[in-house]
Amino acid sequence: MKKLVFLMFAFIIANSGQAQVDKEFYNKYSDAKGVQTTYISPSMFKQMDQEALNIQCDNISLKSVHGMYVIDCDDPATIKRIKKDIDLKLSQNEFELMIESKDGDDCSRIYMAKKGNDTIGLVVFSEDSEDINIVFIDGSTNED
């Protein structure tokens, strides 16, 4: 329950999916053992209340959402591969740890990277002893 609340909180404060890099990551693991995936397109976000999508976080105002990729996994071998890949991706793309919450085996983190003048990338990462959840979110700070 804590993990779900954390993920929903992260979605509310960020509401954004990290374009090409995250699509590749999503595609790599979408058919892996024990993995469940969800993709939310920019068109779906356009159906949402635009005022609700005008999110402000850390002096950054998110004006549009480009999509969101969600990866959930409960297979131990696949989790190990995902964790290795996500650690590499976060270290290579200048992500800053924004929030971290630990409770026993449960650990949740939100990372943010500003890309160029107007794009924001967020990664919401949550794991416990049985599964791992990753949400990639991208958005623009300027109107499209």
Region spans (language model):
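Bacterial Sec-dependent N-terminal signal peptides
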Residues: 1-25
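Generic structural motif
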Residues: 4, 43, 73-76, 115, ...
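Early exported N-terminus immediately downstream of N-terminal targeting peptides
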Residues: 22-81, 85
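Extracytoplasmic
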Residues: 32-35, 63-65, 92, 103-107, ...
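Surface-exposed flexible segments
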Residues: 77-92, 135-138
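Short Gly/Thr-rich strand-loop-strand
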Residues: 87-114
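A short, solvent-exposed beta-edge/loop patch
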Residues: 111-143
